[in-house]
Amino acid sequence: MQKRPAFDSSHIMYRAEELMSHASNRYRITVQVANRAKRRRYEEFDNIDDPMMKPTIRAIIEMSDEISQDDIISD
């Protein structure tokens, strides 16, 4: 039986909160995260990089990284 790696839930919550704070519409960003997670799940169905990381968590991390990169570029 494989054991899931312990994700720092406070870090993921921080990322999700950062994502929500940058969004003008909480519903829209929630739908975007869900759509990205669904798309990534089907795109990488055969080629799974990290089978222990859920697609939703991966989508939150990726989207918050994109927001922080935009902030870095604009500064």
Swiss-Prot record:
Annotated GO biological process: DNA-templated transcription
Alphabetized GO MF terms: DNA binding; DNA-directed RNA polymerase activity
Q: Name one GO cellular component term.
A: DNA-directed RNA polymerase complex
Its UniProt entry gives the catalysed reaction(s) as: RNA(n) + a ribonucleoside 5'-triphosphate = RNA(n+1) + diphosphate
Instruction: State the UniProt keywords alphabetically.
Output: DNA-directed RNA polymerase, Nucleotidyltransferase, Transcription, Transferase
Q: Which InterPro entries match?
A: DNA-dir_RNA_pol_omega, Pol_omega/Rpo6/RPB6, RPB6/omega-like_sf
Going by the record, the broad EC class of this enzyme is transferase
Q: What is its EC number?
A: 2.7.7.6
What assembly does the database describe for this protein? In cyanobacteria the RNAP catalytic core is composed of 2 alpha, 1 beta, 1 beta', 1 gamma and 1 omega subunit. When a sigma factor is associated with the core the holoenzyme is formed, which can initiate transcription.
Its biological function?
Answer: Promotes RNA polymerase assembly. Latches the N- and C-terminal regions of the beta' subunit thereby facilitating its interaction with the beta and alpha subunits.
Q: Which family does it belong to?
A: Belongs to the RNA polymerase subunit omega family.
User: Any idea what this protein is called?
Assistant: DNA-directed RNA polymerase subunit omega
Q: Which organism is it from?
A: Gloeothece citriformis (strain PCC 7424)
The organism that produces this protein has a lineage beginning with:
Bacteria, Bacillati, Cyanobacteriota, Cyanophyceae, Oscillatoriophycideae
